[in-house]
Amino acid sequence: MASDLDIISGALIFDGLPGKQLEQIKDVAISKNYTRGEIIFMEQDMGNGFYLVAEGMVKIFKVSPSGKEQILHVFGPGEPFGEVPVFSGKRFPANAEAIRKSRLLFFPRTAFLGLITAHPSLALNMLAVLSMRLRQFTHQIENLSLKEVPARLAAYLLYLSTEQKREDFITLDISKGQLASLLGTIPETLSRILNRMNKQGLIETKDRTIRFLNREGLESLSIDGKKNELMEKNP
């Protein structure tokens, strides 16, 4: 099992920081364990710090007045979440839940701001991560508002390919129900689209592994799903 220092030093948010600073960051971190399905924080809870996934997986989501859940993002090992309140001192804008047994490193806001004051390079790292997060949410809004579900799915599969550093296949690390919520659709629609992609020779699915048979076709679909016969009218 990786040590807290190894996890911190391997995280993008702390990339390039010298060993002494990493040790100081480790000293303010608090290790917290969560069971599958356990809530980490609720929307409107006071943002008194942020988290880094050491082990497991966490989903960030919102719930509509009717009870419909919309997953906004899923974070795995080495990824931070809940960073915005560190700077704003405001409340969390969404909910966070462990979707598998997880261990998180929690960084209290007051202690972390003290480190940022002492080490401006840490602030630059935080800004880089926040900038990346903004781009991710911009792409997500674009996908949900302008693209049909097949294009959203193709774009997400290609995104996972980049994240997992694999050209020919990816491994789904969340359930199909969770993937459907992330894409703004329902499991039945997602299953139909996956089946059509299989029949058209774009992909081959086996359990949680999806092999790319026609990557160019996926790239084309991700850009303009409306011109592809995979388009679904159902949300």
Residue ranges and their predicted role:
Residues M1-R36, P80, P85-V86:
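Cyclic nucleotide-binding regulatory module and flanking cytosolic helices
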Residues I13, E38-K101:
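Cyclic nucleotide-binding regulatory domains
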Residues G16, V74, A98, F106, ...:
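Short aromatic/basic micro-patch
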Residues L22, F112-L113, L218:
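A generic structural signal for short hydrophobic patches within well-formed alpha-helices
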Residues M57, K101-R103, Q178, T209:
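Structural motif
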Residues H73-S131, R135:
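Cyclic-nucleotide recognition modules
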Residues I99, T117-P187, Q200:
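Polybasic "coupling" helices that flank or enter modular domains
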Residues V149, L160-P235:
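Phosphate-/nucleic-acid-contacting segments
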